[in-house]
């Protein structure tokens, strides 16, 4: 699927959709040279089996093709499993948190970045 500046990729195993990622141009003004991973999901039974890395590799490669210099993403502060995955992949924590409201609850999302993916 594609809309201007936004792309969605799916991960399929044995004919079953097991994961997805959405990405594109960064949605914040001061990051015009950056791509953003908006979402990345994997069915729970496939977590820890290398599929997350395959999805991330594919997304980073697509962002390179679109000539983005850096990649950013936001993740909920309390999502320690995802944060550890991003850190192992090479993302670094930035000092740019934002408040989000999910289900009527205020939560903090923290920003991560990989610099110079080219």
Predicted region positions:
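Residue-level detector of beta-propeller blades
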Residues: 17, 92-93
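Low-complexity, intrinsically disordered short peptide segments enriched in small/polar/basic residues
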Residues: 15, 35-37, 50-52, 56, ...
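Short, charged, low-hydrophobicity "junction" segments
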Residues: 62-69
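C-terminal "cap" of GNAT-fold acetyltransferases
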Residues: 69-72, 76-83, 87-89, 95-118
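Conserved glycine-rich acetyl-CoA-binding loop
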Residues: 39-57, 66, 77-84, 88
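Residues at secondary-structure transition points
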Residues: 6, 28, 32, 50, ...
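Short glycine-aromatic motifs
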Residues: 6, 90-91
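Acetyl-CoA-dependent GNAT
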Residues: 1-45, 56-58, 62, 99, ...
């Amino acid at each position: 699927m594609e809309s201007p500046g936004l792309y969605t990729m799916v991960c399929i195993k044995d004919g079953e959709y097991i994961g997805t990622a959405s990405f594109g141009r960064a949605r914040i003004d001061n990051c015009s040279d950056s791509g953003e991973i908006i979402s990345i999901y994997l069915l729970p039974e496939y977590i820890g089996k290398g599929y997350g890395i395959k999805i991330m590799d594919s997304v980073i490669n697509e962002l390179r093709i679109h000539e983005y210099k850096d990649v950013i993403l936001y993740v909920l502060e309390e999502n320690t499993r995802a944060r550890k995955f991003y850190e192992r992949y090479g993302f670094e924590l930035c000092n740019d948190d934002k408040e989000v409201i999910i289900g009527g609850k205020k939560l903090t999302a923290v920003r991560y970045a990989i610099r110079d993916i080219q």
